[in-house]
């Protein structure tokens, strides 16, 4: 099929920043920071900005550590590279703390409400109707009961609906349109019977316009994968920008920041559908947080085969669902030896 192009290059690799911390008690914690083509910048931010603030420090109170990091580094920006770096390290701290206390992270945060989660297959943007339909059918054969497209052309979206049948279909367009362009597609999009329309406009933080679409389009709006910190999500929720918010734990500031976002969303009767287009500690961190949610949620699973799985038992959803692992920390420890040959 067509080559998948990302930021001007053929997309052949998927880079993530794997974060390892070691405590003076000999405990190792693993985290994950957003990478892709920004991985080098995030790596430098972790090494030069975040790590010096933590080495030799007491990390038993992670919420306090998170606040210190955010306050100390705010002059470098409250979202983007800085927050990606903080997120990865903060996840590793929780993993280490859970292992030290021999408890899964969700037990350190609150009361578990569920341990089985519906999953949806999140497809690439293929730009070819035949491939889209084929990938949808393949996802269903693999047990997924819902699918998310990243297409923007009508014929590809129609192919996705055809391949998915009557099961839930989501559409993430990655911010290509204006308000007017989105409204011009209203009848077509409504006919596709979408569960949600994700990030239809640019810029993604134009919450006022998203709120108009959420009210006028007749399709629930989802957004938030590019937002950071609880304060940005509070603004999003206050303006009624979305029916579904989508924080990404490896972007927003880590586990505790996302926990606060979930708490605020549920107080305002907003559903959280986490952004989880990754395979490492960030995926497990999301499951830990999802177990605390009172409202129903979906877990996103990027639909592609990678050369080496972080956690082989989580390669695919079983009968369209993922089960919360029961071990301490993130639930499963990472076997780095299997991954080390992919280090860059």
Predicted region positions:
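Flexible C-terminal active-site loop/helix
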Residues: 11, 277-344
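Structured beta-strand/loop patches that form or line metal/cofactor-binding pockets in enzymes
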Residues: 1-30, 34, 304, 308
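Catalytic core of soluble alpha/beta enzymes
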Residues: 149, 154-281, 317
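N-terminal small/glycine-rich loop or linker at the start of catalytic domains
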Residues: 76, 101-125, 156, 160, ...
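Histidine/acidic-residue-rich catalytic or RNA/ligand-binding cores of hydrolases
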Residues: 39-44, 234-238, 257-260, 281-292, ...
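Metal- or metallocofactor-binding catalytic centers and their adjacent structured scaffolds
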Residues: 22-100
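Active-site mouth loops of central-metabolism enzymes
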Residues: 116-131, 173-178, 222
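Conserved, mostly hydrophobic/aromatic
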Residues: 26, 50, 89, 102, ...
């Amino acid at each position: 099929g067509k080559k998948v192009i990302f930021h001007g290059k053929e997309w052949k690799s998927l880079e993530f920043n794997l974060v390892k911390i070691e405590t003076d008690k000999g405990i190792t914690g693993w985290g994950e920071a957003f990478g892709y083509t920004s991985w080098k910048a995030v790596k430098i931010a972790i090494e030069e900005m975040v790590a010096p603030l933590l080495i030799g420090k007491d990390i038993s109170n992670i919420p306090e550590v998170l606040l210190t990091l955010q306050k100390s580094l705010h002059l470098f920006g409250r979202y983007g590279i800085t927050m990606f770096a903080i997120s990865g390290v903060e996840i590793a701290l929780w993993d280490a703390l859970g292992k030290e206390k021999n408890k899964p992270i969700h037990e350190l945060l609150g009361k578990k409400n569920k341990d089985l989660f519906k999953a949806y297959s999140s497809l690439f943007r293929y730009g070819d109707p035949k491939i889209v339909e084929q990938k949808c059918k393949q996802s269903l054969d693999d047990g997924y009961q819902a699918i998310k497209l990243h297409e923007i052309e009508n014929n590809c979206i129609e192919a996705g609906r055809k391949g998915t049948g009557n099961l839930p279909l989501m559409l993430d367009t990655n911010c290509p349109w204006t308000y007017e362009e989105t409204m011009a597609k209203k009848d077509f999009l409504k006919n596709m019977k979408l569960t949600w329309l994700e990030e239809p406009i640019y810029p993604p933080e134009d919450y006022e316009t998203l709120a108009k679409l959420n009210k006028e389009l007749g399709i629930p709006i989802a957004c938030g994968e590019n937002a950071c910190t609880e304060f940005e999500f509070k603004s999003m929720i206050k303006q009624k920008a979305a029916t579904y918010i989508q924080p990404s734990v490896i972007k927003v500031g880590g586990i505790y920041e996302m926990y606060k976002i979930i708490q605020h969303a549920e107080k305002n009767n907003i559903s959280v559908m986490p952004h989880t287009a990754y395979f490492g500690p960030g995926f497990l961190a999301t499951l830990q947080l999802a177990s605390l949610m009172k409202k129903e949620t979906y877990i996103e699973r990027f639909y592609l085969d990678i050369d080496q799985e972080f956690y082989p038992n989580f390669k695919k959803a079983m009968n369209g669902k993922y089960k919360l692992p029961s071990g301490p920390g993130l639930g499963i420890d990472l076997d780095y030896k299997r991954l080390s040959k992919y280090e860059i």
